[in-house]
Amino acid sequence: MSPTISHKDSSRQRRPGNFSHSLDMKSGPLPPGGWDDSHLDSAGREGDREALLGDTGTGDFLKAPQSFRAELSSILLLLFLYVLQGIPLGLAGSIPLILQSKNVSYTDQAFFSFVFWPFSLKLLWAPLVDAVYVKNFGRRKSWLVPTQYILGLFMIYLSTQVDRLLGNTDDRTPDVIALTVAFFLFEFLAATQDIAVDGWALTMLSRENVGYASTCNSVGQTAGYFLGNVLFLALESADFCNKYLRFQPQPRGIVTLSDFLFFWGTVFLITTTLVALLKKENEVSVVKEETQGITDTYKLLFAIIKMPAVLTFCLLILTAKIGFSAADAVTGLKLVEEGVPKEHLALLAVPMVPLQIILPLIISKYTAGPQPLNTFYKAMPYRLLLGLEYALLVWWTPKVEHQGGFPIYYYIVVLLSYALHQVTVYSMYVSIMAFNAKVSDPLIGGTYMTLLNTVSNLGGNWPSTVALWLVDPLTVKECVGASNQNCRTPDAVELCKKLGGSCVTALDGYYVESIICVFIGFGWWFFLGPKFKKLQDEGSSSWKCKRNN
């Protein structure tokens, strides 16, 4: 299952915890509208926020104080830019559910999951975006304008091809490779736009109002993800539209993916042109630069990661989320496979929003002390056990289906399961964020936190991809109705069908994977968990980076 509305951790792409990619449940900021952890989860969102709230330096006094009302237009522009950023993220999150409804393999789903990696990796090219620009045009507009033009043009072009790529025009199987390349580019461009907008926020707003930048980011990207994921899946579904929005049933939804792409591509082109022509950049930054250029930034990152305490943290956090990977990455897709309408799963994101707002506020009371990782350690076994509960939920799903639908009590159980899961996900997420803020060297806080959060995000991305990849190899199918045949390869499946048989699943790899992941997770908790907790006992000198200026 996957969270809905992404949380931003260093890689900003989906909210912590998910059922699947769109119902995203990955362990990072989760994108709205799904059950994916993915995505807690943008390069440096938390780092940027820390910089916004930290010491601003002498540059603060170069700007006259301005009221909120005086800068309302700039705040609304930032909000809108973040909404635009959420659109391609939401669309990318909806594709796995669409593919699952077309019965693609989990190997294909694993390949498509690479689409969600750019936000976790944007630290690799963020220094380039910060350092290379056309001065007369503007430091941030030099990247924002061309990036959004490319996004808009690409969306319009893709609107003419997407039906063919999904196999809608000729009843072929979806072209997963082409879809992955297209949406990987979407995510890469959205991540680049995020870097530019984050940087522009620091100069666009005065010192008094710069704190609104993180609010614009959170609200805007969440709204954009909701539009591109939850709203799109609902309006694209003929069943949903016929049941709730129409008087006369029709064979398709109110909008198609092609229509949606064309509309938002046009919006990107028009609004980007207006920004390029009408919005000027301020030249003075509200915050002090931590580094002096590309080379300096990469040297600093390398120096940080070489520190023994940081290296230990990275190795442990990269393996900590293996135990959750089957539940986070596969569960939502399995529910769709068992017949649960994808738009219904997406809409479960809506009642989760208040919970996802309240949880961090409550949990932060327990992570504000000197040992925030204690909360991570205590929440981990509950999240692992909920992974088994998810497997039971998938097993139970076909048993309660009635006349092609599911009773209301089924959705209540799913919603309660998801809510409990979110409590554990956010407990671990807020704990990690608090620890990263606690140990980050204040002299280089933004860069330091961005690095730690990026590694935390990668720790959720790679296990999810591997979990999807292993579902098919771990699944055992038998050929029923034809003697001396098996279903181990695609050719064997075809031969079984030609001989009058059919391939029946004898053992679903998802259940095997769920059990294996829980064993691995508890192994990590017993043997490596105490070592992970001990990191918070390290002295502050263990986390301070020595660098030559």
Swiss-Prot record:
**GO MF annotation terms:** acetyl-CoA transmembrane transporter activity; protein homodimerization activity
Q: Which residues lie on this side of the membrane: Cytoplasmic?
A: 1-74, 135-141, 197-217, 278-299, 365-378, 426-508
Annotated tissue distribution: Ubiquitous. Detected in heart, brain, placenta, lung, liver, skeletal muscle, kidney and pancreas. With strongest signals in pancreas.
The reported effect of residue 113 to R is:
In SPG42; significant increase in the amount of nuclear phosphorylated SMAD1-SMAD5-SMAD8 protein complex; marked increase of the BMPR1A protein level; no change for BMPR2 protein level; decrease of BMPR1A degradation; Loss of homodimerization in the endoplasmic membrane; loss of acetyl-CoA transport activity
Question: Cellular component GO terms, alphabetically?
Answer: endoplasmic reticulum membrane; Golgi membrane; membrane; plasma membrane
**Stretches assigned to the Extracellular side:** 96-113, 163-175, 239-256, 321-343, 399-404, 530-549
What is a biological process (GO) this protein takes part in?
A: transmembrane transport
Q: Where is this region: Disordered?
A: 1-46
Q: Which InterPro entries match?
A: AcetylCoA_trans_1-like, AmpG_permease/AT-1, MFS_trans_sf
> Pfam families given for it?
Acatn
Quickly give the catalysed reaction: acetyl-CoA(in) = acetyl-CoA(out)
What keywords are annotated for this sequence in UniProt? Cataract, Deafness, Disease variant, Endoplasmic reticulum, Glycoprotein, Hereditary spastic paraplegia, Membrane, Neurodegeneration, Phosphoprotein, Transmembrane, Transmembrane helix, Transport
The record describes its membrane topology as: Multi-pass membrane protein
**How is this protein induced?**
Expression is induced in presence of ceramide.
Q: What start and end residues bound the annotated signal peptide? A: none
Membrane-spanning residues: 75-95, 114-134, 142-162, 176-196, 218-238, 257-277, 300-320, 344-364, 379-398, 405-425, 509-529
Q: Where in the cell is it found?
A: Endoplasmic reticulum membrane
Which residues are noted as glycosylation sites? 103
On this chain, the residues bearing Phosphoserine are 22, 42
Look up the record and name the associated disease. Answer: Spastic paraplegia 42, autosomal dominant: A form of spastic paraplegia, a neurodegenerative disorder characterized by a slow, gradual, progressive weakness and spasticity of the lower limbs. Rate of progression and the severity of symptoms are quite variable. Initial symptoms may include difficulty with balance, weakness and stiffness in the legs, muscle spasms, and dragging the toes when walking. In some forms of the disorder, bladder symptoms (such as incontinence) may appear, or the weakness and stiffness may spread to other parts of the body.
Q: Per the similarity annotation, which family is this?
A: Belongs to the SLC33A transporter family.
SUBUNIT field: Homodimerizes.
**Protein name (Swiss-Prot/TrEMBL):** Acetyl-coenzyme A transporter 1
* Gene that produces this protein: SLC33A1
